[in-house]
C-alpha cells in the first residue's frame, strides 16, 4: 500500500511540474510576448530545472506543441464532439461553435497572444495548429454541412471562414487598441450581445437562403 501511495505521489509531482511549465509559457506570452519565450526564462518562471523540459516534452518544440494544443479553441474540436442532434443540419451547432469561440478568445488572453504569434512568425508548432484546425473543420463540414448545402457547400464554407476570422479580429481589436468598432462598444456586455445576435442572424440567413434542399 505504501509503495502504491509513493508511486501516486511521484506521478502527481510529475504532472504538477509539467503544468508549471505550461503555465509559465502562458504567463510569459501574456506579459512579455512570444519573443520572450526562451528556455531559461520558462524554467525560471516555472521554478523547475530546464532539463525537465526535455524529459517531459522532448524539448522546446514539444513544450510549445502541447501548450498550443491546450489553448487553441478550434484545435480542440474533433468529429467526436459532433454528438448533438443534427436534425437542423447543423444550424444550432454552427451558432454554438461560433458564439463559444467568441467568448473563449475574449476571456483568454493567452489565446489572444497566440493568435498574434501565429500571424507574426513561421513556426512548425503553429503550422501544426493550423493543420489540426483544418483537419477538424474538414470533418465537421463533411459530416454536417456538405450534405445539406450540396453544390453550394463551398459558399457555406466561405461564409464560415468570414465569420470565424471576423470574430477573431473583433476580439483582438477590442483587447489591444480600441473598443469601438462600427459604433459598437465591444468591451461592454451590450456590445458583445449585439455581435452575438448578428452571428445568429447571419447563420439563420445562410441556412434559409443558401441551401439547395428544404429543411
Residue ranges and their predicted role:
Residues 64-71, 129:
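Alpha-helical DNA-contacting segments of helix-turn-helix folds
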Residues 105-127, 174-181:
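Amphipathic alpha-helical segments used for helix-helix packing
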Residues 145-200, 213-215:
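Hydrophobic/aromatic-rich alpha-helical bundle segments in the mid-to-C-terminal region
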Residues 75-77, 83, 114, 122-149, ...:
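Amphipathic alpha-helical packing segments from all-alpha helical-bundle domains
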Residues 20, 24, 28-62, 66:
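Helix-turn-helix
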Residues 1-16, 211-215:
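N-terminal intrinsically disordered/low-complexity leader segments
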Amino acid at each position: 500500500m505504501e509503495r502504491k501511495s509513493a508511486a501516486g505521489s511521484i506521478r502527481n509531482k510529475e504532472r504538477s511540474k509539467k503544468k508549471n511549465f505550461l503555465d509559465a509559457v502562458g504567463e510569459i506570452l501574456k506579459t512579455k510576448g512570444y519573443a520572450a519565450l526562451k528556455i531559461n526564462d520558462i524554467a525560471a518562471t516555472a521554478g523547475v530545472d530546464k532539463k525537465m523540459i526535455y524529459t517531459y516534452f522532448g524539448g522546446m518544440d514539444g513544450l510549445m506543441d502541447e501548450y498550443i494544443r491546450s489553448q487553441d479553441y478550434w484545435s480542440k474540436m474533433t468529429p467526436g464532439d459532433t454528438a448533438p442532434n443534427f436534425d437542423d443540419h447543423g444550424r444550432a451547432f454552427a451558432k454554438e461553435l461560433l458564439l463559444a469561440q467568441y467568448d473563449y478568445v475574449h476571456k483568454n488572453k493567452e489565446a489572444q497572444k497566440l493568435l498574434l504569434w501565429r500571424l507574426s512568425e513561421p513556426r512548425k508548432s503553429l503550422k501544426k495548429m493550423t493543420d489540426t484546425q483544418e483537419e477538424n473543420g474538414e470533418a465537421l463540414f463533411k459530416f454536417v454541412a456538405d450534405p445539406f448545402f450540396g453544390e453550394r457547400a463551398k459558399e457555406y464554407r466561405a461564409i464560415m471562414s468570414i465569420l470565424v476570422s471576423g470574430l477573431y479580429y473583433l476580439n483582438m481589436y477590442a483587447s489591444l487598441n480600441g473598443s469601438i468598432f462600427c459604433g459598437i462598444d465591444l468591451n461592454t456586455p451590450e456590445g458583445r450581445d449585439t455581435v452575438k445576435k448578428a452571428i445568429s442572424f447571419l447563420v439563420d440567413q445562410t441556412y434559409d437562403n443558401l441551401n439547395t434542399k428544404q429543411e
